[in-house]
């Protein structure tokens, strides 16, 4: 009897072992809080996006672990980029960034390449608007540029950081219009918006989300959007205007176009399962009604890319920026 029971127990153990071996492995998921690194200051568009996604994930319980948003804005975004690069293999850290992913390394000769990281998803394209103070006499880009040409090197254009998207656009405007501005760099679009409200600068080229509060309050005037087409949102933001009511700069005689990606990246050295987890997380985020409301409120273009399509986009956009930066004369001397 004892031998029979022993053999039966061994058979059961063998079957159990086989079942365990054949069972599918549990999918990876975070085991501690996840940091979203924002390489810009609080209040800017990237910061707002990170905190909005943080709220969506918490509301819909899309992840068991909490998300912590950290601003690492030093050196025009280089601090956040290098921090993420140095976190190789850490799947509990995400970087949310913009075209600074390649413009900062190009301009500053930073020892960083976006290929050092692991692409997750591009979740939107962001627009740029030429804003002036609502009490200024400038009703159109032509009015504004005429004054700038009459007073070369005297009118002040504010923007986020030096030699980044805002100053790149400013340089393109100068070249196309034959004007010259004093460019004033700030840590983020929130500060640039505040400075324009206080009339410390004459204009800025903030993203819509960075100036929506001031526009709604009647402090800022939108002259044109640097996009191929008008923004596709018709809900009124001010008493009389929607995002779609803002003409393109090209419509107004200023042929400058610029859109900026909003992308999430993991450090290098993570596993395919870890990358897949965050791709699927972002797919869940962009499917929520709150995300769609966020896109419309901030006039973001709905554009989602992951996998090879994202890698191809990053390579092409990087090459486009090489040409723009070279034309602007922003490449640092080696």
Locations of regions flagged by a protein language model:
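Bacterial N-terminal signal peptides that target proteins for export
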Residues: 1-12
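C-terminal segment of classical bacterial N-terminal signal peptides
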Residues: 15-25
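Ligand-binding pocket segment of bilobal, Venus flytrap-like solute-binding proteins
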Residues: 73, 154, 158-245
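An extracytoplasmic/periplasmic, membrane-proximal ligand-sensing/linker region
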Residues: 31-33, 175, 216, 272-334
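N-terminal (or domain-start) structured segment
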Residues: 26-116, 154, 178-203, 207, ...
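C-terminal lobe and pocket-closing loops
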Residues: 125, 211-287, 316-319
């Amino acid at each position: 009897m004892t031998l029979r029971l022993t053999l039966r127990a061994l058979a059961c153990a063998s079957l159990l072992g086989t079942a365990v071996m054949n069972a599918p492995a549990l999918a990876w998921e975070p085991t501690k809080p996840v940091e979203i690194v924002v390489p810009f200051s609080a209040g800017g568009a990237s910061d707002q996006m990170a905190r909005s996604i943080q709220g969506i994930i918490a509301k819909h319980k899309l992840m068991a672990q909490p998300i912590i948003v950290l601003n690492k804005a030093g050196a025009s975004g280089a601090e956040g980029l290098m921090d993420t690069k140095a976190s190789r293999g850490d799947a509990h850290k995400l970087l949310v960034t913009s075209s600074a992913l390649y413009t900062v390394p190009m301009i500053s000769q930073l020892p960083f390449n976006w290929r050092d990281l692991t692409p997750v998803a591009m979740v939107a394209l962001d627009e740029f608007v030429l804003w002036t103070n609502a009490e200024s006499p400038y009703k159109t880009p032509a009015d504004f540029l005429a004054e700038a040409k009459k007073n070369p090197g005297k009118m002040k254009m504010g923007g986020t950081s030096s030699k980044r998207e805002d100053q790149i656009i400013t340089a393109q405007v100068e070249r196309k219009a034959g004007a010259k501005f004093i460019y004033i760099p700030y840590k983020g679009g929130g500060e640039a918006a505040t400075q324009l409200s206080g009339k410390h600068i004459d204009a800025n080229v903030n993203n819509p989300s960075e100036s929506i509060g001031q526009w709604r309050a009647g402090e800022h005037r939108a002259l044109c959007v640097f996009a191929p087409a008008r923004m596709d949102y018709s809900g009124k933001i001010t008493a009389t205007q929607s995002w779609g009511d803002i003409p393109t700069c090209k419509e107004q005689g200023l042929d400058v176009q610029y859109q900026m990606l909003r992308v999430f990246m993991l450090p290098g050295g993570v596993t395919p399962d870890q990358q897949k987890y965050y791709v699927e997380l972002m797919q869940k985020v962009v499917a929520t009604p709150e995300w769609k409301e966020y896109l419309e409120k901030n006039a973001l273009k709905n554009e989602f890319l992951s996998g090879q399509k994202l890698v191809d986009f990053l390579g092409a956009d990087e090459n486009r920026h090489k040409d723009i930066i070279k034309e602007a004369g922003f490449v640092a001397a080696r």
